[in-house]
């Protein structure tokens, strides 16, 4: 049953996942080409100068892609269940409800993590050729809040889709926008170093909101 659930979720989300992965790879490649062009024309030293003096990590075009992937996967996964009224049937399958929801969320989370890891690896592999380890670390830490925001957006999107009460949908949406906006509020590189671990833990706890929406749906708390 578990394999069937995972396969079903993969079928629903693979299109969004592959598009998001392709877009991330393309944007990472674009940033690498930008760095390579600057290095070819003005030398690697100029890249270091830009990164240290102007706080330009050459990853700006990647800022909102993980967020879009998180929202897209959440919609692709949960919206068809609700629009086609399949979710109630899903909850009545001969399998633990909590494990089923966990499996569904695990698939979405794995896809978001995969996009984040692939993007990071592409950037890091190139940067390690021309930058000091300290600068490479700075680039990764600058991107990390964007990946956390993707996880937060995914869980909130899933929770909003499942929630059956309009007022609760609006409240969850506003809360989600507020939390995600907070993760993009810092303009400087490594702006969230001191609280990054806290945000990672908080992002995973957002999965509880999905369970809350599932419980309310099962109890018939809908408009």
Which ranges hold each PLM region?
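Hydrophobic alpha-helical transmembrane segments
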Residues: 1-63, 76, 80-81, 162, ...
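Secondary-structure boundary/capping residues
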Residues: 15-19, 87, 98, 131, ...
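Alpha-helical transmembrane segments of multi-pass membrane proteins
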Residues: 7, 11-19, 98-115
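Secretory targeting signals
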Residues: 28-39, 43-70, 77, 102-166
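Short, charge-rich amphipathic segments
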Residues: 24, 55, 82-93, 133-140
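Short, well-structured alpha-helical interface segments that form or flank functional binding sites
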Residues: 1, 84-85, 155
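Helix-loop-helix units of permease transmembrane domains in multi-pass membrane transporters
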Residues: 78-107
């Amino acid at each position: 049953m578990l394999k069937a659930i995972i396969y079903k979720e993969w079928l629903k989300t693979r299109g969004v996942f592959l598009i998001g992965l392709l877009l991330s790879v393309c944007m990472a490649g674009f940033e690498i080409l930008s760095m390579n062009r600057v290095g070819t024309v003005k030398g690697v030293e100029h890249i270091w100068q830009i990164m240290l003096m102007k706080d330009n990590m050459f990853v700006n075009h990647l800022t909102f892609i993980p967020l879009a992937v998180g929202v897209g996967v959440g919609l692709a996964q949960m919206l068809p269940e609700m629009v086609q009224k399949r979710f109630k049937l899903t909850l009545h399958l001969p399998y633990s409800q909590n494990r089923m929801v966990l499996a569904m969320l695990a698939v979405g989370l794995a896809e978001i993590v995969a996009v984040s890891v692939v993007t990071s690896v592409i950037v890091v592999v190139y940067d390690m050729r021309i930058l000091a380890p300290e600068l490479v670390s700075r680039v990764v830490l600058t991107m990390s809040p964007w990946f956390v925001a993707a996880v937060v957006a995914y869980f909130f999107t899933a929770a909003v889709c499942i929630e059956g009460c309009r007022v609760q949908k609006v409240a969850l949406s506003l809360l989600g926008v507020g939390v995600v906006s907070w993760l993009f509020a810092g303009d400087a590189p490594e702006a969230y170093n001191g609280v990054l671990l806290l945000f990672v833990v908080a992002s995973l706890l957002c999965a509880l909101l999905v369970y809350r929406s599932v419980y309310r749906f099962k109890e018939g708390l809908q408009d």
